[in-house]
Amino acid sequence: IDLDFTVDCDRESMLSIRQEVNNEILRYMESDGYHLAPGSKTPHTLDSWVFHYTNAAGNNDGIKIEINYSDRCHIQPAIETHVSIPFLSDVKVRSLSPVELFATKINALIGRSAARDIYDVYNMVKHQLFVSDEEKTLLRKATVFYLTVGSSRKDNATPTEYTDFPQIDKIRFPQIRSQLLPVLRRSEHFDFEKAKTEVKDFLSKLLVLTESEKEYVREFN
């Protein structure tokens, strides 16, 4: 479970509310029989908990909850999505707008290139989620924003040209086999090499920065 704290407030207010959130989540999980694992951690801007429990099959299992407190303000307003689960009542889930959500995924793919990142971005391309010029412009601008403020690049310098994607090229099939395939449906086929090719082609066309965007990146660097 990956959450963002989205209250626009100063650090002192955030820390106060953060403690309330901590207490509420820990109390709820413990009352439902989940046990906090020793590996849980709470660094400066992140709460990361791992809870152990016994699943319906009687096996030991775990659930991870992470709350990010550094990205409190977003580009676009959050949206509410209705989620239908067959054996539960319908629920509303608050999430980032699709454009902003996939901008963060593209940033993660370029920076760290986890197996799930290429899967998510490939499905965005495959299903043509953003087809109009306006949508693609918004996606590019949001991506450029997160490439600067949320970059995981080791050299901390955001490029202004994107003609190749070395981090994506470093992904190997053993990563896909061990990290991605176990969580996909058995009937789902994921063509890894095709996904890499199509994603890199899409990104090379998307990330053609305007002069003003290049100037923004240079000033930020």
Model features per residue range: what roles?
Residues 3, 7-221:
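Structured mid-to-C-terminal alpha-helical surface segments
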